[in-house]
Amino acid sequence: MLASQARPFGRCGQNDLQPVERFLMIRLQKTEWAFLGLILVYSFIPAFGGLIRVLELAGGPQIAPVNARALLAPTPIILHILSSFLFCIVGAVQFLPSIRWHHPTAHRIIGRVIVVAGCVSALSGLWMTHFYVFSEALQGPALYWVRIILGAAMIGLIVWAVVAIGTRDILQHSTSMLRAYAIGQGASTQAVIGIAWIITVGSEALGPLRDGLMIFAWVLNLLVAEILIRSLLRPAKRLRSSAL
């Protein structure tokens, strides 16, 4: 082998690394770490509280209050918790510019996981909404139908995002996934609003008031998503078009 063709011992180019090794070498900006930290804090109660429930259903110690629905039919709630955790926590990585622009392979691999997780989260949520028995204090007709509509919409948005990326429509792919993510993060906003209500009023909201607060959380998430789409994604699309 010629000296010019030889590679130094113990070193290799980035192309020689396996996909997992390349993913571990990804370096994020400080603002991206801050964004991930914010998502972790924002999602803490529903995401990690849900994982505690999974451990309980798997035979672990009882920490959270007993949930009769989970004991009678644990599979849907376990699927919902695990898939929602992946979709909300790991899905946040997909919005990082360092991943999207500089590591497209990692973006695609994570994206496939997120697509499956999002669909499982929505489908299991639909199953629980329809088949679990809720008292009027926990779910009235309005909340029932909003959950059904948004669960179906989340699946439709994820499927549309997959179709869009297949046709190289990046804008449609990004907007659809952002809207689906806003729906999937509903539980986090609901937890924040619920805690704020308890601190302000001194008691938990129940009945139609609780339904209204939970619906408002989804409206707020989708409103933020639309603001981000119009302020960040669409201007970038116009800039690319004007450069052609």
Regions found by a protein language model. Name each.
Residues 12, 18-244:
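Alpha-helical membrane insertion/targeting regions
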